[in-house]
A protein has these predicted regions:
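Flexible metal-binding regulatory segments at protein termini and peripheral loops
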Residues: 1-136, 259-260, 344-352, 761-860
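Conserved ATP-binding TGD loop and adjacent catalytic N/P-domain core of P-type ATPases
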Residues: 16, 29, 442, 528-530, ...
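Conserved cytosolic catalytic loops of P-type ATPases
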Residues: 26-43, 48, 210-211, 242-336, ...
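Soluble-to-membrane junctions at the N-terminal ends of transmembrane alpha-helices
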Residues: 86-108, 158-181, 343-375, 392, ...
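Transmembrane helix-loop-helix hairpins at the membrane interface
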Residues: 97-251, 362, 463, 733-738, ...
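Membrane-embedded alpha-helical bundles of multi-pass transporters
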Residues: 121-135, 164, 183, 422, ...
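Juxtamembrane coupling segments of multi-pass membrane pumps/enzymes
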Residues: 192-196, 201-203, 217-278, 309, ...
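P-type ATPase nucleotide-binding
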Residues: 460, 464-598, 610, 622-638
Length: 860
């Protein structure tokens, strides 16, 4: 998406006009304009010149934020300048300008109010020259009003330009209201002068009361007050983005030819060696090549606890080196750093529109013309009713100045910006406004097991030595671990790495082995201290040694707990069992519990067999476990789940990308792959599952805030316009002075923005106020329908399945059949329980399985 800066917009009608104009340009596929950040995002093949021309023809200004044709080196070299430009764009220049305008306006307005109302209402003294000189009084008021109008000429320039281009905006309403008050007052002044020349003092006094000079000036001053408050509040909504930008280091200390030199961070290139001392910010993303330290990553992840780092660990720009001297190699520089990508995500999200904003957009497109029409009808109606021109004009002007399209236009974007900033501070990044809105509507959360619910790194959980083998050894567990580590040292298997890590932690010495050989799918063999060591699963080791019933029972127990039992034997005797498991993260059960309390159904997807999967699922507390899912099968599972409700898929790996894309909402755990992050709608910077309910909570709070803003914006206009038009005057005698209408208009936008700022108080990790599921949602997502209850199951007995991969092959083949809705396969029991959605012959089922080189012995 190409970004542009748009100038001259003052309300929602302006942004709607720009969006409509650019959308008509040939080659533009989508366009989104943000009134809040004065930015525009455009997708398509149209050139910058075409887009800028379209905006200018609509009566506004535009300029590209960057060039799409830059080379990678250019991008890196210009990253600091781009960052400075982005920071510069967020500087609040509006508030100081508006403050100066307001002060100047008030100086003239106070004098005007003294002469126009002070003497008349409270009897304040006037200079001798003005006593009885009504024409001089009128001329003084005219001059003071002209001064205020000149100071606030921006309203007239913008308002009448919009009217000329057929795109009236909020400034048009203000300009028309003020100009109408001024124009009628000038007419009254000339008429009064003529009456005084003719000696008609009754007419003179009558016309004196028809002066609306103070209204013309007061409208401008009050609207400026509202604009200043609004600009100040809008500046607060971008605080999170500005604070992120301020984190970016300006310089880096690199090592060239053995000499340290300080250079600008935008001059650092990929592969450069840089050093960071304690207390310094890390300048770019890199990998530690020398030294150890603790790094405070709270700027990026929101996690305040420092993370220990050692050689080969990754470090990110803007994080703080707290304790040690480290030397690093730059891996990502310029706009490719994690910090730059976060800033880009947050700013891109601000440039997009939430679907709910379309309501306000549709109204804003016709709002101003409708208000002008209502004002004209109001004036005509009161004149027909026999009221004076002054009375009718006052009612029409009140309609113009009380109507506020700004409140409608700001209702959604300010809440989105604040919500996005709040999320960024907590390490939760929403890529678009639509994703921030949709996350809270999730009904089903599908969790990938590995790396999401679990840590993704197998660890040794149990060491069970065979006491008969280690009769002469004191530390039996340590002795077994020493044998295992010595054999596994030459293996690249993930389970071997878990054993080596445990041996390192326990300071177990590793001996050298010879004749190492890996038996694919079974285990490995090696000679250690003259003994033939065999390691692997039960089926492999039991071919060479006798395994006692107690040890077999222990292995079954481990399997039920989701652990993988590894057997070790020396010559013809069993040494023992070491259980390895991918342990669940500490926060996973609590995260699942919170999601369930929100009324969200939680499903776990895994390629493990049913037994292992159910054990992990039970520990995590999920509602449903779908086991035996191959990497390319996750997308199909998500497709099925989407038939039951809105689905959010949470994953971290490359093989999760298709499922993340298929889901209504893709959520990537931050420690995962770049591919998964690219495919996701929401990125969790911390690898914590507890951030998933936090994201849902923040989304719901933002959506509630948007609804509140839209309600008050609509409610304000629905109540205010009839009151201003004098609808209640015949019944209750209520009428609204144009000055009070202007004051109300000023406060409406300020109130909407202030309400959005309340999102900063949202406690995203506090589950106390979570909404429960409605009965309809629960029934929809948690209960099977009648056709599912009536579905038929068949149990197939299958020979030849040896591992989880075998299970997955059989499961995939069976579920590819149209008549099969689900297949639960277990290689340990040698069965496949098939759930059928329609009739299918046993022969077809048998043929399908045997095509995968397995033998079906019976079907029940």
């Amino acid at each position: 998406m190409k970004q542009y800066t748009v100038t001259g917009m003052s309300c929602a009608a302006c942004s709607a006009r720009v969006e409509k104009a650019v959308s008509k340009v040939d080659g533009v596929t989508s366009c989104s304009v943000s009134l809040l950040t004065n930015s525009m995002g455009v997708e398509g093949s149209a050139t910058d010149a075409q887009i800028v021309e379209a905006v200018e023809q609509a009566g506004y200004g535009a300029s590209p934020k960057g060039t799409a044709t830059e080379s990678e080196n250019d991008k890196a070299n210009n990253s600091l300048e781009q960052l400075k430009a982005a920071q510069d764009a967020l500087v609040d220049r509006e508030t100081p300008k508006l403050r100066n305008r307001l002060i100047a306006s008030l100086i003239f307005l106070v004098v005007l109010m003294y002469f126009s109302m002070g003497h008349m209402m409270w009897g304040w003294p006037l200079p001798e020259f003005f006593n009885g000189n009504h024409v001089a009084m009128g001329l003084l008021q005219l001059l003071l009003t002209v001064a205020v109008m000149v100071i606030n000429q921006k309203f007239f320039i913008s308002g009448f330009k919009g009217l000329i281009h057929g795109a009236p905006n909020m400034d048009t309403l203000v300009a028309l209201g003020s100009a109408a008050s001024f124009g009628y007052s000038v007419y009254a002044l000339f008429a009064m002068t003529a009456a005084q020349v003719n000696g008609d003092m009754d007419a003179v006094m009558s016309y004196m009361h028809e002066f609306y000079f103070e209204s013309a000036a007061m409208i401008l001053a009050l609207i400026t007050v509202g604009k200043m408050l609004e600009a100040h509040s809008k500046g607060k909504t971008t605080d999170a983005l500005k604070s992120l930008m301020q984190l970016a280091p300006k310089t880096a200390t690199i090592v060239r030819d053995g000499v340290e030199q300080e250079i600008s961070v935008d001059a650092v290139k990929k592969g450069d060696i840089f050093v960071v001392r304690p207390g310094e910010n890390i300048p770019v993303d890199g990998e530690i090549i020398d030294g150890t330290t603790a790094v405070n990553e709270s700027a990026l992840t929101g996690e305040s606890i420092p993370v220990d780092k050692q050689p080969k660990d990754a470090v990110s720009a803007a994080t703080v080196n707290q304790s040690g001297f480290i030397k690093c190699r730059a891996t990502r520089v310029g706009e490719d750093t994690t910090l730059s990508q976060i800033i880009q995500m947050v700013s891109d999200a601000a440039a997009t529109k939430a679907p709910i904003a379309k309501i306000a957009d549709r109204v804003s497109g016709v709002f101003v013309p409708a208000v002008i029409t209502i004002a004209i009808i109001t004036i005509i109606a009161w004149l027909i009713a026999g009221e004076t021109v002054g009375f009718a004009l006052a009612r029409g002007i009140s309609v113009l100045v009380i109507s506020c399209p700004c409140a409608l236009g700001l209702a959604t974007p300010v809440a989105i910006m604040v919500g996005n900033g709040k999320g960024a501070k907590s390490g939760i990044l929403f890529k678009t406004a639509a994703s921030l809105e949709a996350t809270g509507r999730t009904q089903i959360v599908a969790l990938d097991k590995t790396g999401t619910i679990t840590s993704g790194e197998p660890k040794v959980t149990d060491i069970v030595p065979d006491e008969t083998f280690f009769e002469e050894t004191g530390n039996h567990a340590g002795a077994l671990l020493a044998i295992a580590a010595s054999v596994e040292a030459k293996s690249e298997h993930p389970l071997a790495k878990a054993i080596m890590e445990r041996a390192k932690t326990d300071e177990i010495a590793v001996a050298e082995v010879t004749d190492f050989s890996a038996v694919v799918g079974n285990g490995l063999t090696a000679i250690l201290a003259g003994k033939m060591i065999k390691a692997g699963n039960l089926a492999f080791v039991s071919k060479f040694v006798k395994v006692s019933d107690d040890m077999r029972a222990k292995a079954v127990e481990f399997s039920k707990e989701g652990k993988t039992p590894l057997f070790f034997a020396a010559d013809d005797r069993l040494c023992g069992i070491i259980a390895v498991a991918d342990t669940i993260k500490e926060d996973s059960p609590e995260a699942v519990r919170q999601l369930k309390n929100m009324g969200i159904r939680v499903v776990m997807l895994t390629g493990d067999n049913e037994q292992t999967a159910n054990a992990i699922g039970k520990q995590a507390g999920v509602d449903e476990v779908i086991a035996g899912v191959l990497p390319d099968g996750k997308e199909a599972v998500i497709r099925k789940l989407k038939k039951q409700g809105r689905v959010a898929m949470v994953g971290d790996g490359i093989n999760d990308a298709p499922a993340l894309t298929r889901a209504d909402m893709g959520i990537a755990i931050g420690a995962g792959s770049d591919v998964a992050i690219d495919a996701a709608d929401v990125v969790l910077m911390k690898s914590r599952l507890i951030d998933v309910p936090a994201a849902v909570r923040l989304s719901r709070a933002t959506l509630t805030n948007i609804h509140e803003n839209l309600f008050w914006a609509f409610f304000y206009n629905v109540i205010g316009i009839p009151l201003a038009a004098g609808l209640w005057y015949p019944l209750l005698g209520w009428k609204l002075n144009p000055m009070f209408g202007a004051a109300a208009m000023s406060l409406s936008s300020f109130c909407v923005v202030t309400n959005a700022l309340r999102l900063n108080l949202c406690r995203v990790y506090d589950p106390k106020h979570d909404r429960k599921a409605t009965p309809d949602r629960k029934n929809k997502t948690n209960k099977p329908n009648e056709s599912e209850e009536k579905s038929m199951t068949k149990t197939m007995n299958i020979e030849g399945m040896m591992c989880g991969h075998c299970e997955a092959r059989v499961k995939k083949a069976l579920e590819a059949l149209d008549a099969v809705s689900e297949a639960a396969v277990s290689h340990e029991s040698g069965t496949a329980v098939v759930t059928l959605s329609s009739d299918i012959s046993d022969e077809k089922l048998k043929e399908t399985v045997e095509a995968e080189d397995y033998k079906v012995t019976s079907i029940q």
